Each structure stands twice: as structure tokens, then as C-alpha cells.
């Protein structure tokens, strides 16, 4: 039973990481006028193929490269900021509860893994993207 509870806590941490990542994209789609409600995102229970949902594709296609790049990086930026906040919280709040510690450590690790995965394995190339930002 303890193992099942740990799996559920880890799943919840992963779900929350993906939800926050998608909210990062969604917020900037909304800010650039491609979405009516930035809170509405789709994160499926099986976690794959999550999207910022309900994006006006016609408006999104007309975005400048710089705006499109900001939207692309918004998800990993949220992951990095949230991981940093969780590290600070973990530093100041120490718990004797093994489940709270598991959640916090999983949450920090998964946020960092999510960001690193997109930076290293994904189709994001920092050098070429920085050129777009500087234009």
C-alpha cells in the first residue's frame, strides 16, 4: 500500500509539472491574442499530448517569430522558475513527513527534467533562437 501511495504522489507531481508547463504556453498565447482564457489547458490523465488548448490557429500563424519564440520558451521558463521556488521552499520548510519530502523532491526533479528535455532533446536551438530575439 505504501508503494501505491508513493506512485500516486509521484504521478501527481508529474501531472502538476506538465500542467504548469502548459499554463506557461497558454498565458502567452492569451497575451498575444490567440486565446480567450489562458487558464484552459488540456492535460490528459495519461500525460502525453498535452496542449494549451483552444488556441486560435489562424491568429497563431500570424505571430511574429519573436512572439512565437516567447510562447515556445514560456513552458520551460515556468518549469525553471517553479523548480527554483520549490528549492527555496524546501530549504526553509523541512518536513519529517516522508510523503511531503517525496512530493517536493519529485516536483523539483521533474520540473528540471522537463526543462532540460526541451532544451537538449527538443527542437529548440538556443543559438539560432537568440538571433531571432536580437532582431
Which ranges hold each PLM region?
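Long, highly hydrophobic alpha-helical transmembrane signal-anchor segments
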Residues: 1-18, 79-95
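Metalloprotease/metallohydrolase-associated module, dominated by Zn2+-dependent proteases
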Residues: 55-135
Amino acid at each position: 500500500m505504501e508503494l501505491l501511495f508513493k506512485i500516486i504522489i509521484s504521478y501527481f507531481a508529474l501531472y502538476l509539472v506538465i500542467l504548469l508547463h502548459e499554463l506557461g504556453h497558454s498565458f502567452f498565447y492569451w497575451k498575444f491574442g490567440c486565446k480567450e482564457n489562458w487558464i484552459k489547458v488540456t492535460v490528459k490523465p495519461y500525460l502525453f499530448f498535452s496542449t494549451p488548448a483552444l488556441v486560435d490557429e489562424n491568429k497563431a500563424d500570424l505571430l511574429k517569430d519573436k512572439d512565437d519564440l516567447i510562447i515556445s520558451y514560456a513552458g520551460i521558463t515556468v518549469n525553471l522558475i517553479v523548480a527554483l521556488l520549490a528549492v527555496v521552499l524546501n530549504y526553509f520548510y523541512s518536513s519529517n513527513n516522508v510523503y511531503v519530502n517525496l512530493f517536493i523532491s519529485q516536483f523539483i526533479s521533474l520540473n528540471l527534467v522537463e526543462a532540460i528535455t526541451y532544451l537538449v532533446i527538443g527542437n529548440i536551438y538556443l543559438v539560432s533562437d537568440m538571433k531571432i530575439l536580437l532582431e
